[in-house]
């Protein structure tokens, strides 16, 4: 991932980098990988996430 710094504006470049990293899901993955997650817990978490995504799509379609 690459972010260019213009006019020595490091703050803006850092903000852009953080935005790109969050959109790519890197922060979320790092949070998950901090500690070992049992397979059963992982399956449960993924199922909950899938339900949330599905509900979100349904809300958008009904609006």
Swiss-Prot record:
MF-aspect GO terms: structural constituent of ribosome
Residues that span the membrane, as ranges: none
Cellular component, GO, one term: ribonucleoprotein complex
Keywords: Ribonucleoprotein, Ribosomal protein
Database matches in Pfam families: Ribosomal_S21
GO biological process, one term: translation
Family in the record: Belongs to the bacterial ribosomal protein bS21 family.
Protein name: Small ribosomal subunit protein bS21
Annotated gene: rpsU
């Amino acid at each position: 991932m690459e972010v260019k710094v213009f006019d020595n504006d490091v703050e803006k470049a850092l903000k852009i980098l953080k935005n790109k990293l969050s959109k790519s899901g890197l922060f979320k993955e790092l949070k998950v990988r901090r500690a070992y997650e049992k397979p059963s817990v992982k399956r449960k978490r993924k199922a909950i996430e899938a339900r949330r995504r599905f509900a979100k799509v349904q809300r958008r379609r009904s609006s």
